């Protein structure tokens, strides 16, 4: 039994390989399909696969590679459609696992060549991908289900899921772009330096304005007004003016008396 857990969506997949599985009995896939409505409660699903290539495995493979989208459950569905929906659930979980790895390793590079390398690495490291890859590489399959065709199909589906989940931030690493973070830090440092230079230049301009203005005496004597001294100055000016007028009058009188 192989068990793989996807922590992001809580899906647990169990793969059982049994040699004594009788195809005449009820298929375990039927049991999975009967729990279609309970899937969102994060139940465990058991998938029984015969190690030998059989018609059931071929149907499972074709449904796995061709039926990518979910079908909402309706009443009066035949068991074959239930089987298809059960396989779609497995396929969706597998695709999410691929997208999570791609988003961590290379968030913006969904290139076919890079995806092919990632798929080959996952085939050796991941149990789910390895099982599907071994089924795909068997000689009894049709040419339309070769590994290159499957990779292209999975690439398209991964790209679709990536665009759907881009805004939801469902997978770790999608929005973590080192180049973008570095550019943000550089812009922040540049803004800080510019603000610092602006503040220093504004302080320098203020100091120049203060130096160019006339000095102001801040002593207490300069700020107080001496009323007595001002009155003495006014009186002295008035006295001088009176003396001048009197002296001029005396001069005129002297001239008149002399004329007499």
Curated annotation (Swiss-Prot):
The keyword Zinc does not apply. One of its GO terms (cellular component) is mitochondrion. Despite weak sequence similarities, may correspond to the subunit B of a rec12-containing topoisomerase 6 complex specifically required for meiotic recombination. Retains some of the structural features of the ancestral archaeal Top6B subunit (AC O05207). GO terms for biological process: meiotic DNA double-strand break formation; reciprocal meiotic recombination. Residues 197-222 are annotated as: Disordered. The keyword ATP-binding does not apply. Belongs to the TOP6B-like family. The lineage of its organism: Eukaryota, Fungi, Dikarya, Ascomycota, Taphrinomycotina. Required for formation of the rec12-mediated double-strand breaks (DSBs) that initiate meiotic recombination. May be involved primarily in the early steps of meiotic recombination. Keywords: Meiosis. This is Meiotic recombination protein rec6. Component of the DSB catalytic core (DSBC) complex, composed of at least rec12, rec6 and rec14. The complex interacts with mde2. Residues 199-213 have a biased composition (Low complexity).
